[in-house]
């Protein structure tokens, strides 16, 4: 079943790459008369898209999304406006979406962290005839809201992929460190990880921590390891969870002995992977979450192209010791 899903994802990406090549293709060479009448600005497509996300472009994660949006706007030769509330504020985000719909753009890209708060605004966009692509969050509700496609990572599948890799590395008993038990997305990450490990004959327990207190998180991880010497592996659900795990293992002298992996990237995580202290990071490739929706909207407006898969998966991608140095350079360039 998992192989078929991976095949479907690979096929979707192959089709998407082909469509991008077509969309990026230069227009036919103009005649001399046309060159004189058509300045460079005329090469711009007449489309204006609006992106509304719950994350600010100044945030390290979302700045990479914004870079993807900007690159796609250049490549597709379209106008794109990127908007976000100043903080994580669903009331403000709803207002931004409503204002975007009122401005009648040619397409809308939204993240959907809270479908209860944003659903009516997204439905209003669809009802107004505005094509909508969702990205990053909302894969489970995008279709029912009328969204054409969702571009992002399905959390269960990402966790499952992490579990497969951890089990392949020889892990038999793991801890999934969850900083927000009850957060559906994070719970799904642990569940996918648990199911993949179980399929390989390994077991997982969930450890709740509070990342507002990194020292306490480190102590909880240390206590869990001391309380069960059979634990041989740890998965954290983000870089802020990886940091106290690294600190705990280093303090116990078990770095490298107990396998460690995490979701998402940070300079500390990338350095640890490069140096062989961590096995891998599960990368949702947020640059693609910014880039691909602009391509999809352009192709939809220009040629009514759609992709059959409701969710275009940008992850899980994996950063390992083999590619960490390259990813470090790409992260410095703002594309990873």
Spans of model-derived segments:
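Flexible loop/hinge segments that line or gate small-molecule binding clefts
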Residues: 115-157, 171, 264-274, 278-279, ...
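Short, solvent-exposed amphipathic alpha-helices that sit
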Residues: 60-75, 158-162, 184-203, 220, ...
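Hydrophobic alpha-helical
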Residues: 110-127, 193, 205, 211-271
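Short, low-complexity disordered leader/linker segments with a strong preference
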Residues: 1-48, 74, 101, 123-130, ...
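Hydrophobic alpha-helical segments within soluble ligand-binding/sensing domains
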Residues: 43, 150-174, 216-218, 265-269, ...
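Extracytoplasmic "Venus flytrap"
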Residues: 41, 46-76, 81-97, 103, ...
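Exported/periplasmic ABC-transporter solute-binding proteins
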Residues: 232-239, 246-288, 294-315, 319-326
């Amino acid at each position: 079943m998992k192989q078929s899903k991976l095949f479907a994802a690979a096929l979707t990406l192959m089709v998407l790459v082909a469509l991008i090549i077509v969309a990026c293709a230069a227009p036919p060479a103009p005649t001399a008369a046309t060159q004189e009448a058509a300045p460079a600005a005329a090469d711009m497509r007449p489309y204006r898209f609006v992106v509304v996300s719950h994350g600010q472009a100044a945030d390290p994660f979302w700045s990479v999304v914004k870079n993807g949006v900007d690159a796609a706007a250049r490549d597709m030769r379209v106008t794109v406006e990127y908007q976000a509330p100043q903080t994580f504020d669903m009331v403000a985000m709803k207002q931004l979406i409503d204002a975007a719909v009122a401005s009648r753009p040619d397409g809308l890209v939204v993240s959907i962290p809270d479908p209860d708060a944003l659903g009516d605004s997204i439905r209003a966009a669809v009802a107004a005839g505005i094509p909508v692509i969702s990205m990053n969050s909302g894969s489970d509700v995008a279709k029912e809201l009328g969204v054409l496609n969702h571009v992002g990572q399905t959390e269960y599948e990402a966790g499952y992929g992490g579990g497969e890799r951890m089990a392949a590395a020889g892990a038999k008993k793991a801890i999934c460190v969850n900083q927000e038990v009850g957060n559906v997305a994070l719970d799904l990450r642990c569940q996918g990880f648990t199911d993949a490990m179980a399929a390989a004959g390994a077991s997982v327990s969930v450890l709740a921590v509070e990342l507002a207190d990194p020292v306490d998180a480190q102590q909880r991880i240390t206590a869990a390891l001391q309380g069960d010497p059979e634990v041989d592996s740890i998965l954290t659900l983000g870089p802020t969870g990886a940091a106290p795990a690294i600190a705990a293992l280093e303090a116990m002298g078990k770095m490298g002995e107990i396998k460690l992996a995490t979701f998402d990237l940070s300079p500390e995580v990338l350095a640890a992977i490069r140096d062989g202290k961590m096995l891998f990071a599960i990368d949702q490739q947020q640059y693609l979450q910014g880039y691909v929706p602009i391509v999809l909207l352009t192709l939809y407006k220009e040629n009514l192209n759609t992709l059959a898969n409701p969710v275009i998966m940008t992850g899980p991608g994996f950063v390992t010791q083999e590619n960490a140095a390259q990813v470090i350079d790409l992260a410095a360039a703002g594309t990873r």
